[in-house]
């Protein structure tokens, strides 16, 4: 038994949805012929189910088409099928089944395929208007067509997706103006927008109301007073040439000027949706929109009355009434504005021209005023500049007079000693260079203070060398040498006077100048040479030693103790050990307290080493700086020897056991005293390269064995180790850690062994 033949509609649907383009193209051509043949009779033809099957095949025929140009061609071919239907009833059914298919399949369309279906909807709507146009815009056909649209798209019961509905509202007036803009009258256009008036008045969807208001009614308001483009261009050229006077400009021309920008916005709104026509056909080579045809004509008063009638019903929601009332007012204003005489428009235009002339005159006046202001400002600036130059010249003359006085009061010194007066001369030129100012603050200030401290008659005439601060001066970091010189100059001059008065240890300079001593000292400091007795300045004693004892007396034990901590403090301040400079203390109390503290520290150290006391007493007995430098070198060698573990002295371990035999052989006193030495602010570095502790071996597996016995306890706070890591040596000679290296006068000690370090 042969299988039953499938209906033709199903076969067309299968071939239309084929993946091969040739099969689809042949199916579309045969479908056109099939529709034309089947609808030749006035009654009958296709049923709704048959047309739904055909439209489903056409929908998926559009689905599988991928290239944009081919998509546009296929969409136009599908839209032209409505003209193949010879029966008017079949035509409306064909259009109705199209909207039903789009409503059913819309939610399954992905984002990449939306554009071609937007284009398909636009072209089908355009061809639907073409059907009405070919039938002469018959009212019966218009009514049936609008009923189909109302039922399948706009009505809430249609369950049409918002994408289909909103796109239909956006393109409705655009496609209607393209097809019937030249033929349709205001009454006919009112019938075409009547479904939107009904839906906007009774729907409860606020978004739909707003979309209808913007896409239909506000678009009508925006394009309201337009005239054909040919007359518009002619009138524009005439107005530009000045052939027409203000009274001869027609009413439409005035409204046209105001609505040129609105036309562009309306066209932009009509092409807002993404579709193939707006992308490819909507623009020509110059980038402008294609000709949309003549604009639709509307009776604004009739539109306002129709909206007022719909909103005056009791079942109209408040939101819809409020939104539509604004549109009603706009349409009423447009209807009233169309009856204004041409004279009023001419007066408005003349007033606008007068305003433009006045504004141009104001701009010219403002430009002249600005030029005058700039000229006045230039003149004022030149005057101010001249006054400033005069002031600067007068100030320079005054400064030069002061400099002459200073030159008469201060004698010149050759060589580097003359740096201070030259820098004082530059003090008057502070605005000229900030670098000289910084040098003046660093060098000239100690020299000025030294001259004022000599007590001669020139001290009263010289102002104190205080650095003048300026806001624009760059902050410069002072060198440590300049900082120490400032401190020395602040402390030393009265003490130098006390020394030079009774003892006469400060002779005058080579020319007897009051500042010669300070400048010579400065020059020698720069050269890095310390003067010895008999050449220039003698080495001054330390300030705390001058207060307690005579500077020229023999060295005593306490003074020798105080020199060592002061030398250590000086060593911290210095960058290198080769230069010997004075150290100024802030006050006498702090110096005495620090001195006493250091005396206690050094007394403990000297008790254990008698040689240190004899060596520390030599520098002051000699009275020269060479012994101080040798003492400092010995001190540094002693500290470095302690760090390198050259002496067998060992620190007290954290965990240790007392050696039984060590009590009888070695007295514990010195060791305890050495361990109890108070902490000082000295910096200690340890030479870890001599560390001989056993290195941990990664291959040692003893730690992997779990312990047994009492050591299995996780944590016992009372448990103590059996022995410490560091062990006290049983027989190690006790000696001081700070003993300086000297020639061995006694029997040499034995060489330390490895057991002495553990």
UniProtKB/Swiss-Prot annotation:
InterPro entries: RRP1. Induction: By DNA damage. GO terms for molecular function: RNA binding; transcription coactivator activity. Pfam families: Nop52. Residues 273-285 have a biased composition (Basic and acidic residues). The keyword Repeat does not apply. Residues 447-457, 498-513 have a biased composition (Low complexity). The modification Phosphoserine is found at residues 245, 350, 392, 394-395, 452, 458, 513, 579, 702, 706, 732, 735-736. The modification Phosphothreonine is found at residue 728. It is found in: Nucleus, Nucleolus; Nucleus, Nucleoplasm; Chromosome. Residues 259-272, 397-408, 469-481, 566-575 have a biased composition (Basic residues). Its main location: nucleus. One of its GO terms (biological process) is negative regulation of GTPase activity. Citrullinated by PADI4. The modification N6-acetyllysine is found at residue 652. Changing residue 686 to A: Abolishes interaction with protein phosphatase PP1 subunits PPP1CB and PPP1CC. The modification Citrulline is found at residue 712. Residues 259-285, 381-598, 660-681, 707-758 are annotated as: Disordered. Coiled coil: none annotated. Keywords: Acetylation, Activator, Apoptosis, Chromosome, Citrullination, Host-virus interaction, mRNA processing, mRNA splicing, Nucleus, Phosphoprotein, Transcription, Transcription regulation. Positively regulates DNA damage-induced apoptosis by acting as a transcriptional coactivator of proapoptotic target genes of the transcriptional activator E2F1. Likely to play a role in ribosome biogenesis by targeting serine/threonine protein phosphatase PP1 to the nucleolus. Involved in regulation of mRNA splicing. Inhibits SIPA1 GTPase activity. Involved in regulating expression of extracellular matrix genes. Associates with chromatin and may play a role in modulating chromatin structure. (Microbial infection) Following influenza A virus (IAV) infection, promotes viral mRNA transcription by facilitating the binding of IAV RNA-directed RNA polymerase to capped mRNA. Belongs to the RRP1 family. This is Ribosomal RNA processing protein 1 homolog B. It comes from Homo sapiens. The gene is RRP1B.
